[in-house]
Amino acid sequence: SFKDPIKYLQTDMMGTAHVCELARRSESKLVYAGSSSAFGGPMLNPYAFAKFTGEQCCEMYSKVYGVSTVSARFFNVYGERQPVSGPYATVVGIFEKQTLDRQPLTITGNGEQRRDFTHVDDIVSGLVALSEGQYNGEVYQLGTGTNYSINDLAGMFGGEKKYIPARPGEAWETLAD
């Protein structure tokens, strides 16, 4: 999202608007896959801004057009078949791959940033529950309510650590409340 923010925002935000419009025309319920990056403020990167705007679009379609929408904010999902590399890899997947490859665990910044890690099975259970209700643009957080520092997580994996520069726009803390 940092490399080409205009293209990214156009794709993500307009894509969400089109899905909302399709839900309106088909009189369907919409469960929006949000992100913990939209929680709190300020929006520190294009991804977070697009996810927050998506939630706002869903709420507007509920209030103006009567579409049943609900947004689910995912908090650092991990579990089976998680990506271990590329732009969608999470720190758990990256650490898993680095451990299997006997590589040092790369930690951005000082490692004291904190994350609420949520297993994919809990996300699925939350989405199923949300899909069964009627909503008016509400936002629900799908997380554990407990967070750990990246250093704590690295300690669970064990092994050598390598600290690299912090990434721009990275939130200091995520925690579902």
Where are these regions (language model features)?
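Hydrophobic "lid"/C-terminal helical patch
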Residues: 127-131, 154-157
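C-terminal "lid/loop" region of Rossmann-like NAD(P)-dependent oxidoreductases
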Residues: 110, 139-140, 148-155, 159-176
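Short glycine/proline-enriched coil/turn segments at helix->beta-strand junctions
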Residues: 24-28, 40, 135-136, 155-161
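Glycine/proline-rich active-site loop of Rossmann-fold NAD(P)-dependent oxidoreductases
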Residues: 52, 77-93, 101-108, 112, ...
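Residue-level signal for the nucleotide or nucleotide-sugar donor/cofactor binding architecture
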Residues: 3, 11-14, 45, 86-90, ...
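N-terminal Rossmann-like NAD(P)+-binding domain of SDR-like oxidoreductases, especially those catalyzing
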Residues: 1-77, 121, 127
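Hydrophobic alpha-helix immediately C-terminal to the catalytic Tyr-X-X-X-Lys motif of short-chain
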Residues: 53, 57-61, 91, 95, ...
